[in-house]
């Protein structure tokens, strides 16, 4: 297996590395940084957003659905369907909800009116399966929360992994500290069983871990500039980020905000701004390291079978053009 470094370059150095009307579904738990990524996506004319699917994580699934509906309306795309997903992990139990990071409403406790329209009658897994069946080989999924909905879609349709074009995932901490505990990143920790199902499904997967996303932040000066500019959504995002920024100061000593979800969105539209390594990734589902993502880089020939053998490798973001990604994100967030 060749697990060397690769640069996924779409051949375009400026702008979005996409054809017209690239089909995208965003699986999300909005969430302040999710909101940034979603609004950026709606401001990318090369994308045809087929829908949003919702999951627990930054908020409960019900609140994620409300926020997704609101964001579609704020972006000016009220007819984009929002399909509600699972309210609990694959194995059941109480979901982990990080409202202490994103505020009780998930949007930094900024007061917004309720959405004017309702969610889809389809579940998230049904919606994902139907769209991938309708457009085989054409649909990219950007997964910004726990991977429960994708795992359920795979379990519903065994051909899902072969029909989806690509899955780009925010998740994992590769050879670095987690952000829930020393071992695990929040999205994977939220449903480790689901993550392992997805990572071993055989789908074309790119995963962007927090070892990448924590290299990029909006500083206090950037946030001030965002709030004062004439961007279409910049004032709203700036207001949301006040709560988010205060949590970063208390939790990490960071005077600003990390750009986890926006960076993962950039991996969809500008993959050339990252380098990748390929390898099989498994997720620990028990013990003190539950949620830990461990990659076999193919550096050693094992003498016997092990839990990594026999699965397809995925692409793990390895390095990032920090300046290039920041420039792209700020341009999108400040776009009139």
Curated annotation (Swiss-Prot):
Listed GO CC annotations: cytosol
Catalytic reaction equation(s): uridine + H2O = D-ribose + uracil; xanthosine + H2O = D-ribose + xanthine; inosine + H2O = hypoxanthine + D-ribose; adenosine + H2O = D-ribose + adenine
GO terms, biological process: purine nucleoside catabolic process; uridine catabolic process
Listed CDD domains: nuc_hydro_CaPnhB
Keywords linked to the UniProt accession: Cytoplasm, Glycosidase, Hydrolase
Gene3D superfamilies, alphabetized: Ribonucleoside hydrolase-like
Presence of keyword Cytoplasm: yes
Expression by tissue: Expressed ubiquitously in leaves, flowers, stems, pollen cells, root tip meristem and root vasculature.
Catalytic machinery residues: 29, 260
Protein family (similarity comment): Belongs to the IUNH family.
Protein name: Uridine nucleosidase 1
Record organism: Arabidopsis thaliana
């Amino acid at each position: 297996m060749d697990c060397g470094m690769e640069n996924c370059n779409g051949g375009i150095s400026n702008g979005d590395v996409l054809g017209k009307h690239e089909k995208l579904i965003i699986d999300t738990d909005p969430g302040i940084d999710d909101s940034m990524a979603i609004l950026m996506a709606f401001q990318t004319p090369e994308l045809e957003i087929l829908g949003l699917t919702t999951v627990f994580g930054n908020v409960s699934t019900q609140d994620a659905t409300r926020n997704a509906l609101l964001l579609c309306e704020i972006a000016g795309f009220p007819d984009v369907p929002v399909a509600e997903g699972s309210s609990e992990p694959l194995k059941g139990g109480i979901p982990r909800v990080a409202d202490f990071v994103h505020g009780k409403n998930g949007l930094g406790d900024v007061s917004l009116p309720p959405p004017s329209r309702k969610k889809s009658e389809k579940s998230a897994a049904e919606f994902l399966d139907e769209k991938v069946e309708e457009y085989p080989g054409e649909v990219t999924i950007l997964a910004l929360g726990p991977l429960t909905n994708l795992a359920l879609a795979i379990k519903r349709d065994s051909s899902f992994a072969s029909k989806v074009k690509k899955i780009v995932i925010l998740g994992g901490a590769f050879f670095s500290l987690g952000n829930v505990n020393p071992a695990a990143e929040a999205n994977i920790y939220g449903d480790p069983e689901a993550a392992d199902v997805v990572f071993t499904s055989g789908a074309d997967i790119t995963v962007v871990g927090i070892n990448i996303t924590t290299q990029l932040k909006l500083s206090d000066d950037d946030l001030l500039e965002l709030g004062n500019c004439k961007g279409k959504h910049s004032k709203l995002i700036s207001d949301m980020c006040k709560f988010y920024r205060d949590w970063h100061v208390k939790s990490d000593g960071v005077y600003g905000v990390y750009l986890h979800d926006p960076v993962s969105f950039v991996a969809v539209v500008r993959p050339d701004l990252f380098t990748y390594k390929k390898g099989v990734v498994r997720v620990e589902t028990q013990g003190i390291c539950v949620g830990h993502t461990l990659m076999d880089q193919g550096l050693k020939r094992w003498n016997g079978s092990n839990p990594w053998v026999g699965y397809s490798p995925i692409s793990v973001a390895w390095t990032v053009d920090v300046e290039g990604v920041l420039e792209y994100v700020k341009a999108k967030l400040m776009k009139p």
